[in-house]
């Protein structure tokens, strides 16, 4: 049955992404033409190591669909020399290697923002995240994808969040995320 699905699908997902796509019936969306086109997705993470040279992003790069990048940690436009986690998250959305790996929205446009300093946990990263969300909003993002969360800051333990703090109203990143959601992001 699986091979019949692959033959009928718009994308040849290969063995590496079919189960992940199928988990949410994503191939149905791809088959009816919903592949992320006209969507603007901001990814806030710890870096996008070498995304410009990896085969998985050939389509995104060739079509100029990375619309903006910014490193809020080092305050520069380049995000390619830092940690790979953001690139890995980016691949689950944007990758397109026929027969090997296809992301969930391989035709979307992207904003890649490094807000996480992977050298340690510092409270400034929450502020970086909010700045990234604000920039995403100003650039017209429809979606923010971020796997970051903040509770403990070993370098500054007095800034740790208590359980009571994590009510969605007290820490800057929760307030920023709430404001983005109220704007429809």
Each predicted region: which residue ranges?
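Short acidic, glycine-rich surface-loop motifs adjacent to enzyme active sites
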Residues: 134-165
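Conserved residues at the C-terminal ends of beta-strands
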Residues: 1, 116, 147-149
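Short, acidic/polar
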Residues: 125-133
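Protease zymogen maturation seam
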Residues: 1-39, 52-56, 156-158, 170-171
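Alpha-helical segments flanking ligand/cofactor-binding loops in enzyme cores
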Residues: 27, 134, 175-178
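Short, flexible loop segments at the rims of nucleotide/cofactor-binding pockets, characterized by
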Residues: 16-20, 121-123, 163-166
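Catalytic-core regions built around general acid/base machinery
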Residues: 167-184
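Subtilisin-like serine protease catalytic core
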Residues: 27-125, 139-142, 155, 181-184
């Amino acid at each position: 049955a699986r091979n019949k699905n692959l033959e009928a699908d718009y994308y040849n997902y290969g063995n590496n992404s079919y189960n992940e796509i199928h988990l949410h019936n994503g191939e149905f969306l791809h088959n009816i033409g919903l592949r992320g086109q006209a969507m603007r997705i901001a990814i806030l993470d710890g870096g996008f190591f070498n995304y410009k040279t990896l085969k998985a992003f050939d389509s995104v790069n060739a079509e100029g669909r990375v619309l903006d990048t910014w490193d809020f940690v080092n305050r520069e436009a380049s995000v390619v020399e830092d940690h790979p986690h953001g690139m890995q998250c980016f691949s689950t959305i944007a990758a397109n290697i026929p027969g090997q790996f296809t992301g969930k929205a391989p035709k979307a446009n992207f904003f890649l923002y490094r807000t996480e300093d992977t050298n340690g946990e510092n409270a400034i990263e929450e502020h970086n995240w909010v700045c990234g969300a604000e920039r995403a909003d100003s650039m017209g993002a429809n979606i923010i994808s971020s796997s970051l969360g903040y509770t403990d800051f070993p370098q500054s333990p007095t800034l740790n969040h208590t359980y009571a703090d994590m009510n969605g109203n007290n820490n800057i990143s929760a307030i920023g995320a709430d404001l983005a959601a109220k704007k429809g992001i």
